[in-house]
Every structure is written in structure tokens, then in C-alpha cells.
């Protein structure tokens, strides 16, 4: 059996992403299912998104409309 390549999502600048979408922290958190507190920690650099959250942020970064449509 061969080795599988492990997907490593890229780091996302959450504050910049939110700014490009022209959303407040509260709006971004509500639309994409994050808590405002978690979003604030990411933006301050206290914590870094990981796992499924990081994957979701990468998808939002590439195609926010598709994520919003899927979440409706």
C-alpha cells in the first residue's frame, strides 16, 4: 500500500478575509458558524484555527458564496 498525501490546509488571515467580505465580527461569526469569542482569539493571534475550522476558512476564502449557499 502506498503512502497517502496528507492534506495540510493553508493558514488563513481571518481578519483580512473578514474585511474582504465587508463583515463585522458578529456577522462573520453568525454566517459561518463560529463563535464571536473564537473569531476574536484568531484575529488577535491568541489562537490559530485548526482542523475542520481551518478547512472551512480555506473554503470561505476561495468561494464564500458556495459556503453560504451550502449553509442555507
Model-predicted regions and their roles:
Residues 14, 33, 38:
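Short glycine/proline-centered loop/turn elements that form peptide/ligand docking sites
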Residues 19, 33, 44:
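Residue-level detection of the helix-turn-helix DNA-binding "recognition helix"
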Residues 28-29, 39-42:
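Conserved hydrophobic/aromatic packing and binding residues within compact polymer-binding modules
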Residues 14-27:
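Short basic helix-loop element that most often maps to the first helix and adjoining turn
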Residues 10-13, 52:
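N-terminal positioning helix adjacent to the helix-turn-helix/winged-helix DNA-binding module
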Residues 1-11, 66-72:
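N-terminal flexible/basic segments that precede or flank functional cores
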Residues 52-71:
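DNA major-groove recognition helix of helix-turn-helix/homeodomain DNA-binding modules
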Amino acid at each position: 500500500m502506498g503512502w497517502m498525501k496528507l492534506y495540510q490546509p493553508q493558514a488563513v488571515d481571518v481578519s483580512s478575509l473578514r474585511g474582504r467580505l465587508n463583515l463585522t465580527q458578529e456577522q462573520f461569526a453568525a454566517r459561518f458558524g463560529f463563535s464571536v469569542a473564537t473569531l476574536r482569539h484568531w484575529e488577535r493571534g491568541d489562537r490559530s484555527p485548526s482542523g475542520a475550522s481551518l478547512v472551512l476558512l480555506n473554503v470561505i476564502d476561495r468561494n464564500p458564496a458556495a459556503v453560504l449557499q451550502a449553509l442555507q
